[in-house]
Amino acid sequence: METQRASLSLGRWSLWLLLLGLVLPSASAQALSYREAVLRAVDRINERSSEANLYRLLELDPPPKDVEDRGARKPTSFTVKETVCPRTSPQPPEQCDFKENGLVKQCVGTITLDQSDDLFDLNCNELQSVRRIRPRPPRLPRPRPRPLPFPRPGPRPIPRPLPFPRPGPRPIPRPLPFPRPGPRPIPRPL
């Protein structure tokens, strides 16, 4: 009788352990939303960055259509911008203000939505920096030149003499060169 009780209690314990084993993996492998996975990737970018300030998510491209398999790698594309918070700050980047004229980077790669899997493969490149782009002032049309006034009746001003020729003796002109001596062409008869 005692053996039957022991086997029944052992059966119950094994059933409880089986149920517990089925429940625990699903709780530990909770899937992240697409945005949460991207925010984790931004945190990893900040951890590995050698720059002075933290980066914060600026723009997130739409998620891929097939988000059924949480463990598979998903293509992603997003933009981050430099914040005013130093990299050593304990403050999360989402609470930091964007730095005026801060660096902007476009990140492209793959992420996973599985919380236990911390794999991501991203390549972030600096976009044309806002601080380097200055808006050009609008081009205004050139002003038209003023028309010359019509001559008015009345006395005309006396024109000033030009600085040339100067008064004084004129130089003697050089004589024209004479033809060279030598054979003369013979005229042809008509």
From Swiss-Prot:
Q: Which Gene3D superfamilies match?
A: 3.10.450.10
Q: Which GO terms describe its biological process?
A: defense response to bacterium
Q: How is it modified after translation?
A: Elastase is responsible for its maturation.
Q: In which tissues is it expressed?
A: Large granules of neutrophils.
Propeptide residues are 30-130, 190
Annotated region Disordered: where? 133-190
PROSITE patterns to which the protein is assigned, alphabetical: CATHELICIDINS_1, CATHELICIDINS_2
SUPFAM superfamilies (alphabetical): Cystatin/monellin (SSF54403)
**Is the keyword Iron-sulfur in the record?**
no
Q: Which UniProt keywords apply?
A: Antibiotic, Antimicrobial, Disulfide bond, Pyrrolidone carboxylic acid, Repeat, Secreted, Signal
List the Pfam families hit by this protein, alphabetically.
Cathelicidins
List GO terms (cellular component aspect). extracellular region
- Give all cystine bridges in this chain: C85-C96, C107-C124
Q: Which residues carry this modification: Pyrrolidone carboxylic acid?
A: Q30
The annotated regions of Basic residues compositional bias extend over 133-145
Bias (Pro residues) occurs at 146-190
Q: What highest taxon heads this organism's lineage?
A: Eukaryota
**Its function?**
Exerts, in vitro, a potent antimicrobial activity. Probably due to an impairment of the function of the respiratory chain and of energy-dependent activities in the inner membrane of susceptible microorganisms.
Family per similarity comment:
Belongs to the cathelicidin family.
Q: This protein is called what?
A: Cathelicidin-3
Which species is this UniProt entry from? Bos taurus (Bovine)
